[in-house]
Amino acid sequence: MEQAAPSSPLGNVIARIASASKIAGRKAGDVTLIAISKTKPADAILDLIDQGQRVFGENRVQESQEKWPAIRAAHPDVSLHLVGQLQSNKAEEAVALFDCIHSLDRPSLVTALAKAQDKLGKRVPCFIQVNIGAEEQKGGCAVADLPALLAQARDAGIDVIGLMCVPPAGIEPAPFFALLDKLADDNGLTQLSMGMSDDLEIAVQLGATYVRVGSALFGSR
């Protein structure tokens, strides 16, 4: 396994995370980089693996089923996260394939995931996705519904480790990241999945523990 060259896209993103962490008085190791590989071919993924990247994210269950089993057979130390919306009827397939789910956002999905986990005998850590900007077109639970959804998930035996958000596009993301951090604190959660290619520095400075980066690593889709 090689190490990412500082001038490579991966090396550049790692340096950005390290710089933002230093400014915030955090250790670089406090933040995990998720390489978002949706729509990208196996060769592009394998190139990042060869450079040392070990955590990847996908948006769709079906696409992941088509390309990831072979990659993971060759690289069993790679971790795969689902960051896109999850249909309840795909819950069992998601539990079987993924190591973490970032898009738990409604009671029906809690029920489906709990059933799938019991059937497969596998517990998958989950983030609750919060619709932090109250946008009708986006997934995520409403801020006001978070305590009830979290309680339901915990009662169902789901390991909720943190919160995830996608702030509204085109406006300053910092207030939304700060709100997600506060919601996590208020609900006893320590992990925050927030920040992408264009705003990862702000997210890291406001407490992100996972950043989801695609275009800065793979180029525009």
PLM feature spans:
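Conserved alpha/beta-domain cores
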Residues: 1-190, 196-198, 204-206
